[in-house]
Every structure is written in C-alpha cells, then in structure tokens.
Amino acid sequence: AAGEEWVEISPETEEVLRLSKEYAALSEGYFDVTTGPLVSLWNIHNEQGHYPSQAELEQVLPLIDSDDLLVKEGHAFLARKGMVANLGAIAKGYIADQVKELLVAQGVEHAVLNLGRNILLIGDKQEGTAFTIGIQDPNEEEGVLADVVSSTGKSIVTSGIDERYFTYQGKKYHHILDPYTGFPADTGQASVTLLSATSA
C-alpha cells in the first residue's frame, strides 16, 4: 500500500504515529519510524544479521523520511513505494503508558511495571519512600549496574548497544540505526536512560 493508498488505522496507531512524527521533528530526524527498510536490511534481530553493501544502503536511505508519513483522522499514508513504518522504538513505551493508565484507573497506588528496559513507577513504595531502580551497565555482564535511580511515579527507559547486535569481521553492529548514514549510530554512548513522566 506504500505510495499507493491511504490505510485505515486504529485510534491507538494514529496516536503512536502522531507522537512519532513529533519526536522526529524534535530530534531533527534522528528518531524516525520510517526506518523499516533499513531495519529489515540489517536484520539485526537475527544473530547473523546482514552487513549491507553501499549499494543496498543507497537503495533504502531515500525511503526514510517521517515527512513522507502522512496521518489524518483514522488513516495513514506512506508517500513512496517501498517505505515501511517500524514502530519498535515507540510501541513498547506507548503500551506501557496505557497499562499504567489502566492500573491507576483501577485504583493501584504503588507499583513497579517492568517491561524489560521500560520501567514505569506508580506512586512510591507503600511506606512512602522512593523506588530504587538499577540501570544495567551495557559494557558488563547482565546484573552489573552502571547507576541507580531513585524516583516516584516516573518512567525510566534505557536503550543500549548491548540489547541486540551481531558481530561481523570482529566488530559489533547494534540495533540503534542512524537514519542519515544507514549504519548503527556511533555517538560514543553505550546506552542512554531517560527519566520522564511517560514511556512513549
């Protein structure tokens, strides 16, 4: 349907797409859900992955542009044939926020929701103190902490180069892709943790 017709979407998908476009603008395009063709090309979810050629990258990079993802009430349109939206970077956070909202509506006052590296806090501990959450060190084995956060009622989301990757010719290639270069982002940071009111 990309490049051909508008697709009917649910209100939830519409909200996620609108948020995605907002984050694309705020990040100057570094957060971009239209990286679907790039994600498929690298195939990092598979242990072998795929190290793409320059020609392959040149084929998919022009398909990445959130400005070409159009959203109107109940419908979405990808402007160019071959475009694919990949909501992996935002969907889990959005779902986590919805679960938290549902629990709060049901009267839950104290809870820790752990969805992997998306952690949401409802209120504080029953005795009135802050929750303490450990942040995994991405350069160490599972369970070795880089930092500890104390908070109440917040969302703590971490993404790092240690989550999904493959090794090619002795070098690790992780899943956080730069939509401008087509390669895994090379920022010098092994992981980033955001503390905010929401997860999405």
What residues fall within each predicted segment?
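Mature catalytic core of soluble alpha/beta enzymes
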Residues: 1-200
